[in-house]
């Protein structure tokens, strides 16, 4: 948060010897090797870019989760990588989890992830970040996503 009170609180903590680098390291610089290899694999082999819709999709099959011994929390943050691609307004990640597919959506600009997730994927969240689910098989869920972005092309331009 960029609220002034947060900055005052952080300044107070720093003046008392708070070691922010140690906290950052514990939270973010603590991957296991398999997680980093998984991220590289899915970015190389599972990410699709739909430039005509300014959209990126990462569809992760169950076989990848098993191959890299990925647990539920290990996919956290995956949705943020494609947001760094110039021109991308919508990012979707779908993870094939047992009986259902879990969706994560992130947007930049004026595309409403919350409305999109509610309308197409039994989900919701916030304007720029939302989640959803699908009971369809992964390939069918991906086809429905592609149809959904086609229906929203004007909002994704």
Model-predicted segments: where are they?
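Hydrophobic helix-and-loop "lid/oligomerization" segment in the mid-to-C-terminal part
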Residues: 1-120, 125-157
């Amino acid at each position: 948060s960029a609220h002034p009170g947060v900055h005052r609180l952080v300044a107070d903590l720093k003046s008392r010897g708070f070691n922010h680098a140690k906290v950052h390291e514990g939270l973010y610089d603590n991957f296991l090797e398999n997680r980093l290899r998984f991220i590289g694999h899915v970015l190389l082999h599972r990410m699709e870019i739909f430039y005509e819709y300014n959209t990126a999709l990462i569809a992760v099959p169950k076989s990848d989760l098993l191959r890299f011994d990925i647990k539920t929390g290990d996919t956290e943050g995956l949705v943020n990588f494609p947001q760094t691609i110039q021109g991308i307004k919508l990012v979707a990640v779908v993870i094939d989890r047992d009986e259902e597919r879990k969706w994560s959506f992130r947007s930049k600009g004026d595309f409403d992830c919350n409305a999109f997730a509610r309308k197409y994927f039994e989900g919701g969240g916030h304007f720029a970040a939302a989640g959803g689910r699908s009971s369809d098989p992964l390939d069918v869920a991906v086809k429905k996503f592609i149809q959904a972005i086609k229906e929203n092309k004007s909002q994704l331009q």
